[in-house]
A protein has these predicted regions:
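Acidic, low-complexity intrinsically disordered tails
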Residues: 1-2, 438, 571-646, 651-662
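ASCE RecA-like P-loop NTPase motor cores
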Residues: 1-595, 634
Length: 662
């Protein structure tokens, strides 16, 4: 099926020229191109038009889950009839395995997997196997090791109507591809058997499958609702993919175990020859235990550290990743490339330094080093045609594109870059408060960037006390719950968002009319010219958009940012005058896909949950503590341990406080 872009938009402003130039470059075989698109110029629409015209599978690479979720939502709207998929890390919480020699401290791996994200990852690889009209929106998770596509596809269970096959053979094959039989609790990754009917709930789909047999022949193949059992559609052929990307062929498992034992013997001898007997004994015990688990259960804790043996790779050879699931002619768009490219560079180095200690001190075999993300050079060899997309391209992109940059400065809405005003630092908090109140009266939103977490929290606390509805956002409030936070800002549930590095989000917030940058003259990463341009651009989607920089010194970064903003404003205003365009604010739907995935809430200083009611008698206090204890036990039963711990701490605080009753 071809890509079919569904949109009321038509290319306007610079979009038509940018699309034509980039498509021509791709057709001419250009491997690297850069799209310099200002905030609100419709870069996502430009990418969508390029994909539609070239009709090739595409990988859209974003630098965090929040931006990836936003892009996924937009591409889903542009291509409702095509396969738009989402591929990010499936961990809600992840503590990697590590060893700290200075304190002789071993930290075991801990992780909480988000099943919804796991389903979306599996759905992404299924789409790449089954169709060419696939767009995968991904974070840097795409350069981390994944099961090999050959092994994953090789273990596929393909069923056809009229096929001669025994019921026992189908169930045996389902177990081989890691599905569990569970006739009572029908959930993702399980199957159940009722007479000659087998029902399978795959890990990559919302719906389940029903296989009806007549003797040893498949009579009917259907898609069913897993809750009600109603038939949605019928199939002539039905492929059932393995439960996990890390499925291992039975014959490969035996070879892998032999290979692990061989490596263990060599490594033990080397450690003993160096006089490191403790490390030798440790690696012997740990590896033998893991192998017994693999033999009996088919799995062990940390099995990914043996991935080189299971995939049959040579030492040092890169692991299979999502990139290996794409056909050779796929396109790569690296969004916010000035941030994403350095992130891709750093992944391998960070992973290697942690693993080296584990190997050196006998916690892992040397082959564990090959369970890693791709080096940047390996990533480059797996991508054949790349478009870097950014308002402030970095030196790598400009060098790779040989300085040839396609500019997209004119916004389809006619909006020009926001006016930038510089004000003194002294009195910045109260001066900003007055500006915030003006925006609140007009039902507009405000973004504030500060330099430290402490300042974000303190400023949020101060503004909340004086009646401003505000939230703060920093690195401790990570992952996809930010989608909910940003949606609530747009809805008007609060008016001010305070953060440290808001520019990195690629935030699409048309309701924001003011961006305030506190301490703008403190030179550094957060106040570089690129960072300032990105942050100022957050107000570029509003007709009254404005930026205030609080600074006492005109730094080189501020000067460069002002010069670039002025250049863009001049070009935009000239275009509007020439074509008689009246600027209008960007209007965008509040709907956000993927919000249902989020479980954690953001930090809210005005939350009523933590408020302690007033007590008039000791009985009221005792009654309230009793209610909290009941809630705590209930939370523990549901495995909501964070909530239970918070309630426990609240109870402890109440019991240690002295109350004066009237």
């Amino acid at each position: 099926m071809d890509f079919q872009l569904v949109s009321d938009y038509r290319p306007r402003g610079d979009q038509g020229r940018a699309i034509q130039e980039l498509v021509s470059g791709l057709a001419a075989g250009e491997q690297h191109q850069t799209l310099l698109g200002v905030t609100g110029s419709g870069k996502t629409f430009t990418m969508a038009k390029i994909i539609e015209q070239l009709n090739r599978p595409a990988l859209i690479l974003a630098h965090n889950k929040t931006l990836a979720a936003q892009l996924f939502h937009e591409f889903k709207q542009f291509f409702p009839d095509n396969a738009v998929e989402y591929f990010v890390s499936y961990y809600d919480y992840y503590q990697p395995e590590a060893y700290i020699p200075s304190g002789d401290l071993y930290i075991e791996k801990e992780a909480t997997i988000n099943e919804e994200l796991d389903k979306l990852r599996l759905s992404a690889t299924r789409s790449l196997f089954e169709r060419r009209d696939a767009i995968i929106v991904s974070s840097v998770s795409c350069i981390y090791g994944l099961g090999s596509p050959e092994a994953y596809y090789g273990m596929l269970l393909l069923l056809e109507k009229g096929q001669k096959i025994r019921r026992e053979d189908i169930t045996r094959r389902l177990v081989e591809i890691l599905y569990e039989r569970n006739d009572g609790d029908f959930r993702r990754g399980t199957f159940r058997v009722r007479g000659d009917v087998i029902e399978v709930y795959p890990t990559y789909d919302e719906m389940a499958y029903r296989i009806e047999l007549f003797g040893n022949e498949i009579d009917t193949l259907s898609q069913i609702d897993p809750l009600f059992g109603t038939v949605r559609q019928k199939y002539a052929r039905l492929p059932i993919y393995p439960k996990s990307h890390y499925v291992v062929q039975p014959e490969r498992k035996k070879t892998a175990i032999e290979s692990i034992l061989e490596e263990l013997g060599v490594w033990e001898k080397q450690l003993e020859s160096e006089g490191r007997l403790v490390e030798s004994q440790r690696i012997h015990q740990r590896t033998r235990f893991d192998l017994e688990m693999i033999k009996s259960m088919g799995y062990c804790h940390g099995i990914e550290n043996y991935s080189r043996h299971f995939s049959g790779r040579l030492p040092g050879e890169p692991p299979p990743t999502l990139l290996d699931y794409f056909p050779r002619d796929y396109l790569v768009f690296i969004d916010e490339s000035h941030v994403t490219v350095p992130q891709l560079h750093g992944m391998w180095h960070g992973d290697r330094s942690r693993k080296q200690n584990l190997v050196d001190y006998g916690f892992r075999l040397p082959s564990a080093m090959d369970n890693r993300p791709l080096k940047f050079e390996e990533f480059e060899t797996r991508t054949h045609q790349t478009i870097y997309v950014s308002a402030t391209p970095g030196p790598y992109e400009l060098t790779k594109s040989a300085g040839v940059v396609v500019e997209q400065i004119i916004r389809p809405t006619g909006l020009v870059d926001p006016e930038v005003e510089i004000r003194p630092i002294r009195g910045q908090i109260d001066d900003l408060l007055a500006e915030i109140r003006l925006r609140v009266e007009r039902n507009e939103r405000v973004l504030v960037t500060v330099l430290t977490k402490r300042m974000a929290e303190d400023l949020s606390g101060y503004y909340s006390e004086v009646g401003v509805k505000c939230r703060y956002m920093h690195s401790e409030i990570e992952t996809l719950e930010r989608v909910r936070l940003l949606r609530d800002l747009r809805r008007g549930e609060y008016d001010v968002l305070i953060g440290i590095n808001l520019l990195r989000e690629g935030l699409d917030l048309p309701e924001v009319s003011l961006v305030a940058i506190l301490d703008a003259d403190k030179e550094g990463f957060l106040r570089s010219s690129g960072s300032l341009i990105q942050t100022i651009g957050r107000a570029a989607r509003h007709l009254s958009g404005r930026a205030i920089l609080y600074a006492d010194v005109m730094t080189d970064s501020i000067r460069r940012a002002l010069d670039e903003t002025d250049r863009r404003r001049t070009v935009q205003q000239a275009h509007n005058e020439e074509h008689g365009i009246t600027p209008t604010s960007i209007m965008r739907s509040l709907d956000m896909s993927l919000v249902h995935i989020l479980k954690a809430e953001y930090a809210d200083l005005t939350s009523q949950d933590d408020a302690v009611p007033e007590f008039n008698t000791q009985q009221e206090l005792d009654s309230y503590i009793g209610k909290l204890e009941s809630d705590m036990r209930e939370a523990a039963k549901k495995f909501e341990f964070e909530k239970a711990a918070k309630l426990r701490d609240n109870i402890k605080d109440l019991r240690t406080k002295e109350f004066l009753f009237s």
